[in-house]
């Protein structure tokens, strides 16, 4: 069983780790071994693929702030679940040799597939960014 409060807490924790640029290993217990992550710029599989993606993005974005807006269970198969997630993401980007950074501000619409690992912990097995809605004044990816 997966409850809405558990999903909300899991997603909030996930985004907090992204905000603080937590050590990569902090994400290992949150991802299934065969995880697939579909981002606008690439699709990655496994923890190694996630690690490559993560190390790239933490070198690009700073002053990140993720605010969870929606985390709804959309499918319950007993031992696996799908969730609709919407997060408001704000981040700064500096592209050398620009004299200043730019600010990214958007809602990211996502679908997460989740299951329990062998210890019973909740993990993401598939993570898809469905689309992004930019706020007025935001730079674009």
Annotate each predicted stretch with a short phrase.
Residues 77-94, 106-108:
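A short hydrophobic beta-strand element
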Residues 31, 87-91, 128-131:
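Short beta-strand segments enriched in hydrophobic/aromatic residues
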Residues 1-33, 37:
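Short, low-complexity N-terminal intrinsically disordered segments enriched in polar/charged residues
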Residues 24, 28-77, 81:
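A solvent-exposed, acidic/Ser-Thr-rich amphipathic alpha-helical stretch
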Residues 60-62, 89-105, 133-139:
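Short, cysteine-centered beta-strand-loop-beta hairpins and adjacent loop/turn segments enriched
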Residues 38, 90-94, 115:
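A generic structural motif
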Residues 82-84, 102-141:
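Short beta-strand edge/turn micro-motifs at domain boundaries
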Residues 6, 61-63, 68-70, 98, ...:
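A broad structural signal for short, well-ordered beta-strand segments within beta-sheet-rich domains
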């Amino acid at each position: 069983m997966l409850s809405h409060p558990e999903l909300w807490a899991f997603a909030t924790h996930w985004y907090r780790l992204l905000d603080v640029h937590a050590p990569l290993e902090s994400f290992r217990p949150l991802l299934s071994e065969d995880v697939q992550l579909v981002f606008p710029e690439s699709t990655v599989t496994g923890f190694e693929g996630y690690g490559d993606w993560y190390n790239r993005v933490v070198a690009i974005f700073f002053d990140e702030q993720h605010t969870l807006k929606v985390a709804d269970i959309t499918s319950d198969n007993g031992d696996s679940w799908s969730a609709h997630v919407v997060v408001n993401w704000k981040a700064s980007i500096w592209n050398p040799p620009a004299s200043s950074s730019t600010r990214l501000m958007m809602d990211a619409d996502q679908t997460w597939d989740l299951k329990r690992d062998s210890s019973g912990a909740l993990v993401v097995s598939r993570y898809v960014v469905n689309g992004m809605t930019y706020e007025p004044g935001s730079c674009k990816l």
